[in-house]
């Protein structure tokens, strides 16, 4: 797949969980092959739902989510399915291939190295591993598929410092597309070069280019500008309302002037930029 090809496209996508919980409203964006992007937003705002839309596990109410017709997608799962806990290591990884892989042991060893996990016996059962080891095996199971789009949700949660370093090195050299959700700013800054920012209030996605820290600073500057504009509008609105009250009390033709003042105040209210709750959390990323 050529480097400049669009591998993922959202076209006027709207999705909601019930009438009162919209996630996306007419969202459009495109991701090119080889992009490494952070998906940013407030906790619980629908980032995981976005991954499910890409995987085809959820269907939008309107619009279209499309992956390049030859493209493959894999995600680092959070838990091993109950019916797979009795699988051996070899069986667990073999299920991700449609044909027998004669070099499967080497492929397994390579992806386990990427998550800093020593190669176990191939006949060891998945339920014999600790929770942290299972998390690494799940992450490795996404890597072994060598997908065109790799989706990672908090991949560093069960990794120590050395494990994060191994994974970072792997992702830097990975030539395909990576979308990642993570609160580990240093990890994100090491290999991503853009952000898809999910706005919980407008239910849209904003695209930013640059390393993680630069993008966070850009968003913070935008927020500060919006806050400053809101302060100015609040002052103007208050003045217009005070003037409207004065004119209304004088009666006669001045009541019409008072009404115009109130209408102007309402219009200014609509122009205010809503302070996003998730924006307040940006310094924590």
Which residue ranges define each predicted feature?
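ABC ATP-binding cassette signature C-motif
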Residues: 1-226
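Flexible nucleotide-interacting loop at or near the entrance of a catalytic core
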Residues: 2-4, 8, 21, 218-285
């Amino acid at each position: 797949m050529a480097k400049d090809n669009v591998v993922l496209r959202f076209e006027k996508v709207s999705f909601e969980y019930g009438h009162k919980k919209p996630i996306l409203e007419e969202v459009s964006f495109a991701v090119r092959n080889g992009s490494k992007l952070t998906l940013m937003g407030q906790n619980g705002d629908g980032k995981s739902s976005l991954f499910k839309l890409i995987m085809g596990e959820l269907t939008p109410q309107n619009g279209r989510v499309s992956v390049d017709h030859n493209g493959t997608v894999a995600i680092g799962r959070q838990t091993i399915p109950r019916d797979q806990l009795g699988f051996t290591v070899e069986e667990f990884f073999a299920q991700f291939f449609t044909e027998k892989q004669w070099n499967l042991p080497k492929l397994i060893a390579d992806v386990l190295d990427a998550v800093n996990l020593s190669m176990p016996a191939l006949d060891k059962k998945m339920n014999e591993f600790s929770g942290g080891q299972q998390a690494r095996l799940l992450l490795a199971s996404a890597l072994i598929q060598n997908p065109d789009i790799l989706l990672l949700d908090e991949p560093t949660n069960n990794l120590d410092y050395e494990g994060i370093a191994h994974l970072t090195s792997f992702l830097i050299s990975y030539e395909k597309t990576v979308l990642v959700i993570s609160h580990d700013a240093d990890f994100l800054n090491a290999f991503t070069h853009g952000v898809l920012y999910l706005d919980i209030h407008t239910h849209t996605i904003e695209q930013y280019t640059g390393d993680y820290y630069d993008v966070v600073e850009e968003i913070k500057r935008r927020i500060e500008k919006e806050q400053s504009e809101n302060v100015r509008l609040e002052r103007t609105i208050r003045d217009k309302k005070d003037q409207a009250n004065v004119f209304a009390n004088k009666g006669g033709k001045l009541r019409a002037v008072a009404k115009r003042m109130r209408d102007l105040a309402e219009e200014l209210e609509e122009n205010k930029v809503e302070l996003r709750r998730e924006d307040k959390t940006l310094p924590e990323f």
